[in-house]
Amino acid sequence: MTGISLALKPRQVFGNKNKLIRAQGLTPVHIFGHGLKSLALQADTLELESTINRAGSSHLVNIKLDTDKKTRKVFIREIQRNPIKGYLEHVDFYQINLKEKVTAEIPIHFSGESSLLKEKGHKLIAPFTHLTVEALPDDLPPEIHIDLSQFDTLEKDLYIKDIILPGGAKILNEADLLVAKVSEVHLKVETTVAVNPAEESGEKPVAHIEEKESTEKE
């Protein structure tokens, strides 16, 4: 899996003084990891926002530091934003070992067309938006692709055990959980009963009797 690059620089201010670099269009960040001393760094805020949007929590990010000869492979671990204005306050990156398996939440992406879904009265049942995947960092898929064209009958159900990921990646969710199926939509038919206005008001209906003119002579 190809990573996304981001350039970082060492940070010289800490604590409440971080607001000074935020005013300059920079965001404080940290890199930490197993057996790694935490690094206090800073990033261009616009570039960092772009990286967050592209990488999410499941894409590798290649961190470039002026002091390093090699790039660092990291995942975005935590994003802190101002609760009122929403701007970035701080981001944590977790540096990984490429030889050790990692676990990540991978989004499900549906593509293709189902002949059933083109018809009225059918809908897609998809309980999950993400699945938990374990793999070596370079083998983590950016998405789990599901082709909707396979759902051509109502009997077609797709379970986690039916999904095979490339590169030795493994889905950790229970194998018998349903991932997708097409189901019929059962419409509720509402019946309207006509109510006599007199009955609705609680009054007894009055019988209308037509008087026929007598044809007999008196």
Swiss-Prot record:
Gene Ontology cellular component annotations, sorted alphabetically: cytosolic large ribosomal subunit
Organism this protein belongs to: Dehalococcoides mccartyi (strain ATCC BAA-2100 / JCM 16839 / KCTC 5957 / BAV1)
Gene name of the encoded protein: rplY
Family statement: Belongs to the bacterial ribosomal protein bL25 family. CTC subfamily.
Pfam families xref list: Ribosomal_L25p, Ribosomal_TL5_C
Protein name: Large ribosomal subunit protein bL25
A GO biological process held by the record: translation
Keyword rRNA-binding appears in the UniProt entry: yes
Role according to the record: This is one of the proteins that binds to the 5S RNA in the ribosome where it forms part of the central protuberance.
